[in-house]
From Swiss-Prot:
Top-rank taxon: Eukaryota
Signal peptide (UniProt feature, chain positions): 1-22
Membrane topology of the entry: Single-pass type I membrane protein
Subcellular location: Secreted; Host endoplasmic reticulum membrane
Protein name (Swiss-Prot/TrEMBL): Secreted RxLR effector protein BLR08
Physiological role: Secreted effector that inhibits stress-induced relocalization of the transcription factor NAC069 to the nucleus, thus affecting its broad role in abiotic and biotic stress responses.
Family: Belongs to the RxLR effector family.
Gene name of this polypeptide: BLR09
Residues bearing glycans: N25
Alphabetically ordered keywords of this record: Glycoprotein, Host endoplasmic reticulum, Host membrane, Membrane, Secreted, Signal, Transmembrane, Transmembrane helix
Motif RxLR-dEER mapped to chain: 37-83
């Protein structure tokens, strides 16, 4: 029983470590992409490209009216909220947004990931040792 508890604690610790490391990597990639966009010269779309985009937008709007999920296989943004469901996507995007961190604010993402890992870790330890 004790070996299973140690294994579970090791898994939780590795997940927490991975999530913190991946958070830093995502922030670095976002920064590089923003820099590349800033350095790239702006190119105005041609009339042909605008027509193609208009056709795609029209098809997506028609699919949305018919109830199809769209090209990516996922519901369009905000569609669940429009149908009266809880805005989970908005909730989690706001919870794990790194915009505040990038601007020097409080690291909310790291805070919540650490809090989540701590709660799971404490639950596993209390279950292993019979603490209620």
């Amino acid at each position: 029983m004790r070996h299973k508890c140690l294994l579970a604690m090791a898994v939780v610790a590795s997940m927490a470590f991975y999530s913190v490391i991946s958070t830093k990597n995502v922030t670095q990639v976002d920064t590089v992409q923003q820099e590349n966009r800033r350095l790239r010269p702006r190119v105005e779309p041609t009339a042909n490209e605008l027509d193609k985009q208009s056709d795609v937008d029209t098809k997506l709007e028609a699919d949305r009216r018919l109830g199809y999920p769209g090209e990516s296989g996922f519901m369009l943004e905000g569609e669940l909220e429009e149908r009266g469901g809880f805005p989970w996507r908005t909730f989690f995007l706001g919870l794990f947004a790194s915009v505040i961190e990038e601007r020097g604010g409080f690291p909310w993402r790291t805070f919540f990931l650490g809090l989540f890992a701590s709660v799971i870790g404490v639950s596993i330890i209390s279950a292993c040792y019979g603490i209620t």
